From Swiss-Prot:
Role according to the record: Serine protease inhibitor. The major targets of this inhibitor are plasmin and trypsin, but it also inactivates matriptase-3/TMPRSS7 and chymotrypsin.
Key word Disulfide bond present: yes
Source organism, top-level taxon: Eukaryota
Residues of the site described as Reactive bond for plasmin: 403-404
Keyword line: Acute phase, Disease variant, Disulfide bond, Glycoprotein, Isopeptide bond, Protease inhibitor, Secreted, Serine protease inhibitor, Signal, Sulfation
PROSITE patterns xref list: SERPIN
Location(s), subcellular: Secreted
Family, as annotated: Belongs to the serpin family.
Keyword Glycoprotein tagged: yes
Pro-piece positions: 28-39
Tissue-specific expression: Expressed by the liver and secreted in plasma.
Protein name, entry field: Alpha-2-antiplasmin
Organism: Homo sapiens (Human)
CDD domains registered for this protein in UniProt: serpinF2_A2AP (cd02053)
Length: 491
């Protein structure tokens, strides 16, 4: 079973000092109460009180589309194109995060970040809008927020939950069109900040706790005094293995940090696990798809060399590389460590490096408000729990697969992983694990248990190898029955 939670918050501040905005009537209800229109509020709705008009200066305006164009269901071609764009954005984002992080293990939800940025794109104009579209690899089409919203609504019912909320400084004038689209596409019901930091923090953290089913207890520890708008979204994913691991087979084992050291881990095991896996043309990376129910997959990438970095691997990966045709499930002896990962980060520097520095300096967000706004913070937190629980496979499947020849796939060295929604191909989470048990003391390997990479790769000699660790294009070897080796993992 995999339990994942992703949370992201964008905060906006006034561009020049605190905002002094006079509003005769508060258009938002107090923090923590849902917007309603009672019998004494029939004359005008709360949203109408925020209407400042939809006329904007010349130039490219906020994301708009002809009536009905973006309300249609995504076509297979649009879904396919969006999945590839999201994969490219994921690689860009995670490569930069990994370059600057000193943490042994990382996890983030690129979908959560993309949703927040596409939410922002609803109110972005001119160069700000263009940069957002470029970073998200979305081209110039106006329907990105609508496509992401529609696809997220259809993701694995029961396993996937997306919650969003918008917090506003009391009385701050937000354009009605932005509020309406936020509610329609992201379910981000506007709630006003009280101005009392202690109360606001308590209420925000309570919402986060409820949205993540208690897995993120305290997300924010403080708010900038000049914060006028917060966008939060929380992703909750509970993935049950389609073929569960037998807890009685889980045992203490070694995870190889490098050529010299190991750490003890709880290793889940299965003797005949139905697994889709393959090697790339240069056999330094093993890739396996562990299926969840509800059309989700935990995709593991295990480089066979210890000397690798995330940027090297992701630079040569694409959606098509990780989703090859004609790769079928086969009975496999599997070892996979139980995991608990938690990582929180500020993405301001990372997004600036991607080309969005304008958001934090002088963005054009006049589709949100005529008041000058600047993004003051982008906080993200994700959590992953990986355990044995799943849904038992049908007995007929087990019997049929047990008649086939067995291979082995062992995740006992540093690896990357993705969680994909298989129907749409959207990457929900991405992460890397260098040390699944960082609190444990490192153990020195005995000499005979420390084979060199040359020895380790002898079992892969049936596959062509290139001269470089990671070549310019990682391609797949056509899978053939006789080409599946018995992996000789380090012990």
């Amino acid at each position: 079973m995999a339990l994942l939670w992703g949370l992201l918050v964008l905060s906006w501040s006034c561009l020049q000092g605190p905002c002094s905005v006079f509003s005769p009537v508060s258009a938002m209800e107090p923090l923590g109460r849902q917007l309603t229109s009672g019998p004494n509020q029939e004359q005008v709705s709360p949203l109408t009180l925020l209407k400042l008009g939809n006329q904007e200066p010349g130039g490219q305006t906020a994301l708009k589309s002809p009536p009905g164009v973006c309300s249609r269901d995504p076509t297979p071609e649009q879904t396919h194109r969006l999945a590839r764009a999201m994969m490219a954005f994921t690689a860009d984002l995670f490569s930069l995060v990994a370059q600057t992080s000193t943490c042994p293990n990382l996890i983030l939800s690129p979908l959560s970040v993309a949703l927040a940025l596409s939410h922002l794109a609803l109110g972005a104009q001119n160069h700000t809008l263009q940069r957002l579209q470029q970073v998200l690899h979305a081209g110039s089409g106006p329907c990105l927020p609508h496509l992401l919203s529609r696809l997220c609504q259809d993701l694995g019912p029961g396993a996937f939950r997306l919650a969003a909320r918008m917090y506003l400084q009391k009385g701050f004038p937000i354009k009605e069109d932005f509020l309406e689209q936020s509610e329609q596409l992201f379910g981000a019901k506007p709630v006003s900040l009280t101005g009392k930091q202690e109360d606001d923090l308590a209420n925000i953290n309570q919402w986060v706790k409820e949205a993540t089913e208690g897995k993120i207890q305290e997300f924010l520890s403080g708010l900038p005094e000049d914060t006028v708008l917060l966008l939060l979204n929380a992703i909750h994913f509970q993935g049950f293995w389609r073929n569960k691991f037998d807890p009685s087979l889980t045992q203490r084992d070694s995870f190889h940090l490098d050529e010299q050291f190991t750490v003890p881990v709880e290793m889940m095991q299965a003797r005949t696990y139905p697994l889709r896996w393959f090697l790339l043309e240069q056999p330094e990376i093993q890739v396996a798809h562990f299926p969840f129910k509800n059309n989700m997959s935990f995709v593991v990438l295990v480089p066979t060399h210890f000397e690798w970095n995330v940027s090297q691997v992701l630079a040569n990966l694409s959606w098509d590389t990780l989703h090859p045709p004609l790769v079928w499930e086969r009975p496999t002896k599997v070892r996979l460590p139980k995991l608990y990962l938690k990582h929180q980060m500020d993405l301001v520097a990372t997004l600036s490096q991607l080309g969005l520095q304008e958001l934090f300096q002088a963005p054009d967000l006049r589709g949100i408000s005529e008041q000058s706004l600047v993004v003051s913070g982008v906080q993200h937190q994700s959590t992953l729990e990986l355990s044995e629980v799943g849904v038992e496979a049908a007995a007929a499947t087990s019997i049929a697969m047990s008649r086939m020849s067995l291979s082995s796939f062992s995740v006992n060295r540093p690896f990357l992983f993705f969680i994909f929604e298989d129907t749409t191909g959207l990457p929900l989470f991405v992460g890397s694990v260098r040390n699944p048990n960082p609190s444990a003391p490192r153990e020195l390997k005995e000499q005979q248990d420390s084979p060199g990479n040359k020895d380790f790769l002898q079992s892969l000699k049936g596959f062509p190898r290139g001269d470089k660790l990671f070549g310019p294009d990682l391609k797949l070897v056509p899978p053939m029955e006789e080409d599946y080796p018995q992996f000789g993992s380090p012990k």
